[in-house]
Amino acid sequence: MAAITAALVKELRERTGEGMMDCKKALEKAGGDIEKAIDDMRASGAIKAAKKAGNVAAEGAIAVKTDGTSAVLLEVNSQTDFLALQDDFKNFVAESLEEAFAQKLTDAAPLIASREAAREALVAKCGENVNIRRLVRVEGDVVGAYLHGNKIGAVVVLKGGDVELAKNIAMHVAASNPEFLDSSEISAEAIEREKNVFLQLNADKIAGKPENIVENMINGRITKFKAEASLKEQAFVMNPEIKVGELAKKAGAEIVSFTYFKVGEGIEKPVDDFAAEVAAQVAAAKQ
């Protein structure tokens, strides 16, 4: 049996895209024979799944489950929206959500580990990368959730009130995507950034104006920014005549927290250059 050196593990990892520990195990099983290790990994479908792991998965689905006092919000990504609509993917998401809820998981790491075999099987079958990206669990007196087309999900925790109110506020969160619960959470740095952006965008309008007028303009913009960014100060989407905070207060409730997920949020999607791809294929064919 050949010695399982770090260099050998590194070579197998570079050739297959698999993780270090998986490569080490494969080499140990193959008696240090790297070619046999690769064949074994190919036969198990591991390499196919590992290679797909490098592909950007920015589509997918948001899933949520709640029992009125707790909820789990989950995002699972796929490479294409087409796969996200298929039963195999939907079943994977549903099973992952059920496991996370039943085990009261508070983050994605243990779920990713326990669902890895199922994920690899799905990747091998569908030919796309699939990732469990993130998970949040919340608990409280009253918990409501809203899911919009499996692409946007929101969860709201209330102290007082009822599930229907929490669900309606979650619907508002899904529609408005507030940044903060209330204006007291907005940092001085965020306000300063907003002020600087306002000054840059309105340089021509404020040029030559008295300092007190400029200050009033800035204060007006900051007040508007706080109202737009804060959940409690936003106009309720189902009744713009009332603010969300006032809605909760009238119902004898207090909004404790909210969580918002949108599929692919923050993931940089690759831009396909079809012309360049065709040109590359033509050039390769001429060689």
From Swiss-Prot:
What is stated as this protein's family in its record?
A: Belongs to the EF-Ts family.
Q: What does this protein do?
A: Associates with the EF-Tu.GDP complex and induces the exchange of GDP to GTP. It remains bound to the aminoacyl-tRNA.EF-Tu.GTP complex up to the GTP hydrolysis stage on the ribosome.
Question: Which PANTHER family does the record cross-reference, listed alphabetically?
Answer: ELONGATION FACTOR TS (PTHR11741), ELONGATION FACTOR TS, MITOCHONDRIAL (PTHR11741:SF0)
| GO CC terms | cytoplasm
Protein known as? Elongation factor Ts
Keywords, in A-Z order: Cytoplasm, Elongation factor, Protein biosynthesis
Q: Where in the cell is it found?
A: Cytoplasm
GO MF, any single term: translation elongation factor activity
Q: Does the keyword NADP apply?
A: no
